[in-house]
Amino acid sequence: MFVRAGRYVHRVSTILRGNAAEAAVLNALIRADLFVLVPFGDGCPYDLMVDTGLETFKVQVKCARIRDHCITFNSCGTDHGRGRESYEGRADVFGVYSPQIDRVFIVPVDGSPHFQTRLRCTPTRNNQQRGVRYAGDYAVEDWARSLGRAAA
């Protein structure tokens, strides 16, 4: 089998980055005293599931990067050949890991842009408030508390 070196290296680094993000989100959810289920195999449309005992949440894990004072992540999937696909109906929340600041955020899929989502780390220069998502509002610890009960 012939493998192009450049594509192979890119694919491996993408897989490793995704694995690191999944491990970080899993760790953060467990530290927040939540029960976390890990689906078996790669055929599942989500990466993790949180079970509170009262409801379940399908979690799609994303690795973010910081650009222009914002935590930025792709809020769509690519199904190689079919283009961009929304996660609506396939996941309930994004578990977003930012390796640059080593933090995890939980962002609802509903209401997220269908291509790229940005969470601001700092206030806007023009003091705009409408439509601005601040990263601090999506901390994993706050989301866990908002569920009403931790599954400890």
What are these regions (language model features)?
Residues 101, 105-152:
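Non-catalytic C-terminal interaction segments of nucleic acid-processing enzymes
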Residues 28-30, 57, 73-88, 123, ...:
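Conserved functional hotspots at enzyme active or ligand-binding sites that engage polyanionic ligands
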Residues 62-104, 109:
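Catalytic cores of nucleic-acid endonucleases
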Residues 29, 48-50, 55-65:
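Conserved catalytic cores of phosphodiester-cleaving nucleases, focusing on short active-site segments
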Residues 38-39, 106:
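A structural signal for short, well-ordered beta-strand segments and their strand-loop junctions
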Residues 42-45:
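Short acidic/glycine-enriched loop/turn segments that link adjacent beta-strands
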Residues 2-37:
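Acidic-basic catalytic patches of nuclease active cores, encompassing PD-(D/E)XK
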